[in-house]
Amino acid sequence: VVAADALLQTGLSPEALLRCASEGERGPKRDTHPDNIAPALHGGIVMVRPEEPEIVIPLPVPTGLAVALVHPDLELETSEMRGILPDVLPLKQAVRQWGDCAALVVGLYEEDWDLITRALVDRAAEPHRSPFIPGFDAVRAAGLEAGALGAGLSGSGPSMFALCRSVSEAESVATAMAGAFAEVGLEGSDTHVSEVGDTGAHVIEAPA
């Protein structure tokens, strides 16, 4: 949508671009949540309130924060992974998850690595999706042992992510996690490492 907006010179606002991009992610139930689109457009880390229109709230990125992403040689259908999630979350479990979310926001603002580590817990989706990832627990453990702040399932999977204090640490973590996947027969995982930047999708100038 950013490229189309630039090509057509429509001058759409960030909010309008978000709505257009979100339409492309609508599922069979005609529902959508811009949890992927918003950070791609805005960059960095954002929080999204699912209102009409959605409210996108940028959050601070601690200095040096990097991410390692490991994609094993495995295919999972996003629609199926969405379908296995329960419609209702037990109150006790929900309360703990709300607390984790709040702690993560505070950790980002204060650059508190320890608090970020303790807050990186998915109590809602991961318990239901992780059984479909061979070696999930071992892969996460390998990432943590290599120094990651936290690790878990990326979206619907099968990719797994890890947040790290630096790019060099993230490279070591990615290697360790890919190795753990190989030990359960999923060799040749794709790995990607990047600092968490604050620049979203934008038009770049072609080299002269």
Give the residues covered by each predicted segment.
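Short beta-strand->loop micro-motif that forms the acidic, two-metal-ion catalytic signature
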Residues: 157-164
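ATP-dependent small-molecule kinase catalytic core of the GHMP/sugar-kinase superfamily
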Residues: 13-146, 165-208
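Stable alpha-helical structural segments in soluble proteins, enriched in small hydrophobic residues
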Residues: 1-7
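Long, contiguous secondary-structure blocks with strong helical propensity
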Residues: 5, 145-148
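Phosphate-binding glycine-rich loop
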Residues: 10
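Short beta-strand
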Residues: 150-154, 193
